[in-house]
């Protein structure tokens, strides 16, 4: 009798155990199905990413090139965005199988020199005449701001974050313009879009260029793309304190040590055309009112001494004040 009762009592226990095992099996199966779905989603995303990268790469294959290297160059009076993007985009083109070399129009400023030194990157060669060369423009699309001979150059591409300029070509070109804070941000996006790994040195100079052109993300032109680019590039570059890096490079931007008045006036100088009027403007920044006032006096004399060297109807010098990157005038 006791054995019979024991058998009867054990039946529910066996059923419970069976149900638990069955439920566990169902749960495992569902987990496996979910994991499989997740993997399929990841595989699809990776395939889509690879497809987009392949399509982006194919989009530049129709560049009409003449014999010789591609010179990647920015505007006259080169700032950090112009210098650093020329270097970074030339490296990108080389990684994509093209022969490219960065160039500048004239000597770089203290800030750009500081960024390149920190990254361990050499200053690009100066290009005296662009006539007849394969040219890829960065950070501008204006003949008035371009290197000498640009109107007779073979322009194959433009990467810019300004308005549409006067540069025109009869052949197909790579043209990319975005309304964001720095051309360097566009170049960063191109590395991602083309699936090219960003080396530490390139990440370092792109980081410096974005910080410079957006005034550490305080400029009105700053976008979410610029904000996302900074931590991404800083991690690769090994820059732990972005704000400290900006303060250091900004101090260099406000330094005119060892420069003549003519060099100061034309350090950040650009020319524009409005209708039939062509004018030029040199932009300067000072850290305080005393320095700004002294610079203003010097630039007034510099305009009188050197203004006639430029082929413009009007020429200006604008002296502003900035403290730790913040405009205070």
Predicted regions and their residues:
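Bacterial N-terminal signal peptides that target proteins for export
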Residues: 2-13
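Hydrophobic helical h-region of N-terminal Sec-dependent signal peptides
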Residues: 15-20
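C-terminal motif of bacterial Sec signal peptides marking the signal peptidase cleavage site
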Residues: 22-25
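Bacterial lipoprotein signal-peptidase II cleavage site
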Residues: 27-33
């Amino acid at each position: 009798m006791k054995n019979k009762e024991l058998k009867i009592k054990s039946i529910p226990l066996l059923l419970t155990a069976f149900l638990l095992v069955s439920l566990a099996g169902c749960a495992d199966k569902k987990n496996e199905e979910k994991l499989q779905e997740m993997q399929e989603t990841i595989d699809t995303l990776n395939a889509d990413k690879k497809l987009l990268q392949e399509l982006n790469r194919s989009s530049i294959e129709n560049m009409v090139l003449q014999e010789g290297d591609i010179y990647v160059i920015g505007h006259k009076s080169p700032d950090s965005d112009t210098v650093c993007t020329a270097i970074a985009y030339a490296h990108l083109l080389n990684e994509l199988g093209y022969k490219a070399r960065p160039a500048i129009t004239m000597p770089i400023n203290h800030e750009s020199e500081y960024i390149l030194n920190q990254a361990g990157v050499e200053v690009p060669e100066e290009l005296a005449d662009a006539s007849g060369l394969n040219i890829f423009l960065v950070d501008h699309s204006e003949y008035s701001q371009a290197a000498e001979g640009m109107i007779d150059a073979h322009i194959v591409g433009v990467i810019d974050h300004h308005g549409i300029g006067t540069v025109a070509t009869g052949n197909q070109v790579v043209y990319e313009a975005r309304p964001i804070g720095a051309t360097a941000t566009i170049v960063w996006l191109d590395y991602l879009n083309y699936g090219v790994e960003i080396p530490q040195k390139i990440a370092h100079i792109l980081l410096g260029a974005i910080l410079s052109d957006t005034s550490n993300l305080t400029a009105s032109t700053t976008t979410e793309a610029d904000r996302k680019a900074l931590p991404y590039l800083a991690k690769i570059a090994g820059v732990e304190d972005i704000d400290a890096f900006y303060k250091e490079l900004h101090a260099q931007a406000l330094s005119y040590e060892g420069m003549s008045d003519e060099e100061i006036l034309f350090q950040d100088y650009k020319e524009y055309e409005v209708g039939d009027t062509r004018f030029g403007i040199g932009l300067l920044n000072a850290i305080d009112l005393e320095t700004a006032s002294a610079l203003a006096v010097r630039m007034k004399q510099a305009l009188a001494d050197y203004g006639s060297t430029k082929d413009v109807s009007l020429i200006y010098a604008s002296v502003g004040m900035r403290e730790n990157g913040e405009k205070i005038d």
